[in-house]
Amino acid sequence: MVGNLRTGAAMTAYMDHKDLANEVIDQARAQEITDGVHRVLDRIASAESAAGRAAGSVQLLAATKTRDVGEILAAIDAGIRVIGENRPQEITVKADGLAKRLGERGYSLGVIDAAEADTANAAAATHIPFHLIGQLQANKISKVLPVVDTIESVDSIELAEKIARRATMRGITVGVLLEVNESGEESKSGCAPSHAIDLAQRIGAMGGLRLQGLMTIGAHVDDERTIR
């Protein structure tokens, strides 16, 4: 999402002072977000056309770390249709406000609302998927279930089994992506590529989980052959 990046101590100080549950932003900030979203969507549309891909075949997920509820709503009003959070604690703070305000707009959020929408025969197009895109510690699973639809950072059988058990106990099915460290960089998380097929098969057979694909980040290099 549009905004300045903050790291380290500056990020900690920022998080201490920002009310992430805030639901109201001024018109200038809303317009800034709208303009940023439209620029990105236009670039995606141009890239799809240049690559000969169907319009809408590339899905944009807005990473909403450090953005408050009002800012996220502005992004959704501008055309964002999938959101992702890095931190379980931010999901906890924002989920209720987002679900309430999105409901007023005719949308549903996350796995709970999706189930309710299905019961009410609501159109699937009104659903806003909510992803966890950051690392998940086992003791934080309860913070993200049953709010998120998809957990994108599953990199071991142990973590998958714990998520599956919690999901089954709640009577829900959670989407997961198997995180693969295909670049081999030690600074990145994920299983080794040589283990990916075996892990994917085992995770795909677990109750309570729906394996949706892989999450990978390529090496930060300019060589197109290496990237591919």
Regions found by a protein language model. Name each.
Residues 12-228:
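Conserved alpha/beta-domain cores
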Residues 1-11:
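N-terminal amphipathic/basic-hydrophobic helices that include classical n-h-c signal peptides
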